[in-house]
Structures are given as structure tokens and as C-alpha cells.
A protein has these predicted regions:
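Upstream accessory/linker segments immediately N-terminal to the RecA-like ATPase cores of bacterial MutS
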Residues: 1-98
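Conserved pre-motif I regulatory segment
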Residues: 79-129
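Pre-Walker A (Motif I) flank of P-loop NTPase domains
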Residues: 119-128, 138, 151-154, 206, ...
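Conserved SF1/SF2 helicase motif Ia
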Residues: 125, 139-168, 176-181
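Conserved helix-turn-beta segment of the N-terminal RecA-like "Helicase ATP-binding" lobe
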Residues: 163-200
């Protein structure tokens, strides 16, 4: 293999076309591509080998990041979003009367970013990461209240009935005394109660729906779904998450919550 590589490298009579701009090479002190390829195989010393490795690793990650940015820009142009122009009585009433504690600086910052996204005219696709107990559910609820203030419904999907019930009870308690209809939909809810929930979704009487995979069934339809919150997103398939998009005339805003993000989700 060494003889073969020496033979191949020896055939490089001219420098290879550079794949990075001169400005980028200078800014990051990168080795030219031809030198990097030669020194990765036959380095004159450990320092030269490290520089060659760094150059090739840098280029690979640079183009990965560039493609992610390009995908994000294309996605913003492709998917228009509902414009939530106002923060109204529901949000303000909750903030002034029901907020259980003062928001942390991180929660305030995230809410500000979410409000900006919701009013930008493009579909929000935001990942909300925080440790267990950091207040992600409260941020998600306040985001859903913005949807309600603008005449839209909101839906939260959790991977298990236990977690869905937990969110349901927490949100009902947080909204105590407010005129907001919240319902729970799981596979174990059947009969007249299920029919009443499905009917309320179609009329818009059910403003917030919390549930499991049951919320993506074909029989579940909304009057005006504006925001989807997905908890523990890594436990859902991509196709399962995407099915919620079909529940609205145009794709609803998406807020994904997790304590343990995975690379695939970050790329999305």
C-alpha cells in the first residue's frame, strides 16, 4: 500500500484545485489542499501531520455546516408559517395571575426568540433543550398561549401515556381559573369522551390538545392547528412527527423539547 500511495502521490505534477477560498485559508492558517494530501500520507514530522489532518477535518466539517445552513435557508423559503402578531389577553392573563414563579433569564431569552420566530412569517422549527426540571414545559405552555391569542389551536405530543398524563395535569393546574379548554387524547380514551374531544377539535372549542401517538391518527383533525410541541422527540420517528404537519392548512409552527438531543435532530 505504501508503494502504491507513493506512486499515486508522485503523479501529482501540478497542485490540485483549491476547494477553500484564500481568505479562509489565511484566516484559519490552513495548509493548501495538495500539501495536506501529500503530508497526510508521507509527513515530514508530527507537526506537519497534525496540520494536514486539521486541514482535511476542517474542510469536511466546513462543508457539512454549509450544507446545513443551505438546507435551513431553503426550508425557510419553502415553508411559510402562520404569523402570530400579538400577545393578547390569554398570555398576559396567565403571566400576571397564574405564573407560578419568576421566569429565569434563560426562559425569558428563549421566549423572546420563540415570539420572534412566531411572528416572522415562516414556519418555526425550534429545538428547546434543557435539563429535567429546568422549566421547558412552562416555556412550551406560554408559547401555546401565544397561538391561542392569535386564534389558533396548539397540540403537545408525548411518547407515553404516563408522560402525556403528567403534562396534562401540570398544564391544567397552571391554567387553573382560566377559560382555556385543555383535553387529553391517548389510546386508552375511547367512546363518548373520545368523540367529544374529536368534535371539540373540529369546532375549535378544544384549544390545547395533549396526547400520545393517538393525536396523529387519521380521525384526529383540527379547526386551526397553529403550534405543535413534541416532547422527548428522539422517541418518535421522523415520519410520525411530520404527520402532525398534515393536520393544518399550512405547516404549523414546531417546538421540539428534549433533555438529550441527538445529532439527527440537531441537523433537522
Amino acid at each position: 500500500i505504501e508503494k502504491m500511495m507513493k506512486s499515486l502521490v508522485g503523479q501529482l505534477n501540478e497542485p490540485l484545485p483549491e476547494t477553500l477560498s484564500p481568505a479562509l485559508l489565511a484566516e484559519h492558517h490552513l495548509m493548501p489542499l495538495t500539501d495536506a494530501l501529500m503530508n497526510i500520507h508521507f509527513p515530514s514530522g508530527p507537526d506537519v501531520l497534525r496540520k494536514a489532518e486539521y486541514r482535511l477535518k476542517f474542510e469536511e466539517l466546513f462543508y457539512v455546516q454549509l450544507n446545513i445552513l443551505r438546507y435551513a435557508k431553503d426550508r425557510q423559503r419553502k415553508y411559510r408559517g402562520y404569523v402570530f402578531e400579538k400577545v393578547g389577553d390569554i398570555f398576559n392573563g396567565f403571566y400576571s395571575r397564574n405564573l407560578p414563579f419568576e421566569l429565569t433569564n434563560a426562559q425569558k431569552r428563549v421566549l423572546k426568540e420563540i415570539r420572534r420566530d412566531l411572528g416572522a412569517g415562516r414556519q418555526m422549527n425550534r429545538l428547546l433543550q434543557g435539563d429535567v426540571g429546568s422549566g421547558k414545559t412552562l416555556v412550551a405552555l406560554m408559547s401555546m398561549l401565544i397561538a391561542l391569542d392569535n386564534g389558533y389551536q396548539a397540540c403537545m405530543m408525548a411518547p407515553t401515556e404516563i408522560l402525556a398524563n403528567q403534562h396534562y395535569e401540570t398544564i391544567r393546574e397552571l391554567l387553573y381559573g382560566m377559560d382555556v379548554r385543555v383535553e387529553l387524547l391517548t389510546g386508552s380514551i375511547k367512546g363518548k369522551r373520545r368523540e367529544a374531544i374529536l368534535s371539540g377539535l373540529l369546532t375549535g372549542d378544544v384549544q390545547i390538545l395533549i396526547g400520545t401517538h393517538a393525536v396523529i391518527e387519521d380521525t384526529v383533525n383540527f379547526a386551526s392547528l397553529g403550534l405543535v410541541v413534541i416532547d422527548e422527540q428522539h422517541r418518535f420517528g421522523v415520519a410520525q412527527r411530520a404527520r402532525l404537519w398534515t393536520k393544518s392548512v399550512q405547516p404549523p409552527h414546531v417546538l421540539v423539547m428534549t433533555a438529550t438531543p441527538i445529532p439527527r435532530t440537531l441537523a433537522m
